[in-house]
Design a protein with these regions (language model features):
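Catalytic cores of alpha/beta
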Residues: 1, 43-65
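Glycine-rich phosphate-binding active-site loops on the catalytic face of alpha/beta enzymes
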Residues: 3-10, 59-82
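Conserved, mostly hydrophobic/aromatic
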Residues: 4, 40, 62, 147, ...
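Active-site-adjacent beta->alpha loops and helix N-cap segments on the catalytic face
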Residues: 12-27, 79-89
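Long, charged amphipathic helices and adjacent flexible linkers at domain junctions
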Residues: 30, 89-123
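Short beta-strand/loop segments at the ligand-binding rim of alpha/beta enzyme cores
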Residues: 30-48, 131, 152-156
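Nucleotide-binding motor/catalytic cores of P-loop/tubulin-like NTPases across gene-expression machines
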Residues: 143-145, 151-189
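C-terminal binding/interaction regions
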Residues: 190, 194-196, 204-217
Length: 218
């Protein structure tokens, strides 16, 4: 779901925009829909090498509201400082997530689907056993999005046999993705997880990892 700041500003009185934005993001998260906040995020950087403090707060608040991504438009397409704009936005996002990820509001409703219940249980188990990673096998991306919306601070990796889904996961909060072969048995899934994590130097023998799958293999 795109949330265009300028469109809300046209359709609503300005004083209503912040609350409507927060509610829109919350609603999308509840239904496991990715949210991209866009338009005029760092508008002043079209002609200035530094953003205004209000713009910095706008970008940071998009993260704290629970958005998956933010998007630049005129700042990089016609602006005088496209590289600096991207660098500054990245710094704002990284700093906000590093210092304020625990301030992102939790979902206010209980899961209504089997997939939602499984991902919630997986997060609770992972946090209880202090797992190093949560690994999600998905063919459509739905399980990864349901996991992402819970905003766990444990690193999450989505394994998928679909390259288009792997690319799409780059816009899902907190999800790294890996392309794997389609397998016929859960033991093969565990082998793929071991091969990826150990091969990338991300885990070692004895590390705990929670693995879930959106559908049975085969």
């Amino acid at each position: 779901m795109f949330k265009f700041c300028i469109d809300l500003g046209v359709e609503l009185p300005p004083e209503q925009v912040p609350i409507v934005q927060k509610k829109a993001v919350e609603y999308a998260r509840r239904w496991a829909k990715p949210v991209i906040v866009a338009t005029q995020m760092l508008e002043s950087m079209i002609s200035s090498p530094v953003p205004t403090r209000a713009e910095v707060s706008d970008v940071a608040n998009a993260v704290l509201d629970g958005a998956d991504a933010v998007m630049l438009s005129g700042e990089t397409s016609v602006g005088q400082y496209p590289i600096e704009t991207v660098q500054i936005m990245a710094r704002i996002l990284e700093s906000t997530e590093e210092r304020g990820a625990d301030r992102i509001p939790p979902l206010g409703t209980k899961p209504r689907t089997q997939g939602g219940a499984i991902t919630l249980a997986a997060v609770e188990v992972a946090e209880f056993v202090e797992a190093k990673f949560i690994c999600i096998f998905t063919e459509s991306g739905d399980s990864a999005r349901r996991m992402s919306r819970l905003r766990s601070l444990i690193p999450m990796i989505a394994f998928t046999p679909e390259d288009s889904i792997r690319r799409r996961m780059s816009l899902t909060w907190g999800i790294k993705s890996a392309l794997v072969d389609r397998v016929q048995h859960t033991d093969e899934m565990y082998h793929q997880v071991d091969e990826y994590l150990m091969g990338q130097g991300l885990a070692k023998d004895g590390d705990k990892v929670v693995v879930i799958s959106g559908s049975p293999p085969g």
